[in-house]
Amino acid sequence: MFTFYMYLAPIVAGVLIGLNWLLAKSNPNIDKAGPFECGFTSYQQSRAAFSVAFILVAILFLPFDLEISSILPYVTSAYNNGLYGLIILIIFLMMLVIAFILEIQLRVLKIERSYDKDRSDSNYYDHEI
């Protein structure tokens, strides 16, 4: 069965590359055809703006995600670890909860809204052009 998949994987990859080559739109451009060098003239806007709140959520998500994934080995060996492993797990989870409560108290997770609360809909639509 392993030999079958060893032959099948390159065949599927070749078919997909061939389909892409046949069905892809061709949009030749002198900038695309040449080698990439610093300072070339861009033919479209290359940097799109995104919210700072997105970066904040991503930065806060990363440590908690890594810490939660470090709990997974305990799940597979909970029987062998016994009471000592359970106590270590509870201490670890308490540190996570305390860190999360601290972030909430410091208002790190408060994301500002993009609309103005003082502006009502009637004032928004009643101005003259």
Swiss-Prot record:
Enzyme class: translocase
Reaction equations catalysed: a ubiquinone + NADH + 5 H(+)(in) = a ubiquinol + NAD(+) + 4 H(+)(out)
Keywords, ordered alphabetically: Electron transport, Membrane, Mitochondrion, NAD, Respiratory chain, Translocase, Transmembrane, Transmembrane helix, Transport, Ubiquinone
Pfam families recorded: Oxidored_q4 (PF00507)
Keyword Membrane: yes
Function: Core subunit of the mitochondrial membrane respiratory chain NADH dehydrogenase (Complex I) that is believed to belong to the minimal assembly required for catalysis. Complex I functions in the transfer of electrons from NADH to the respiratory chain. The immediate electron acceptor for the enzyme is believed to be ubiquinone.
Record-stated family: Belongs to the complex I subunit 3 family.
Entries under PANTHER family matching the protein: NADH-UBIQUINONE OXIDOREDUCTASE CHAIN 3 (PTHR11058:SF9)
Protein name listed in UniProt: NADH-ubiquinone oxidoreductase chain 3
Natural source organism: Candida albicans (strain SC5314 / ATCC MYA-2876)
The encoding gene: NAD3
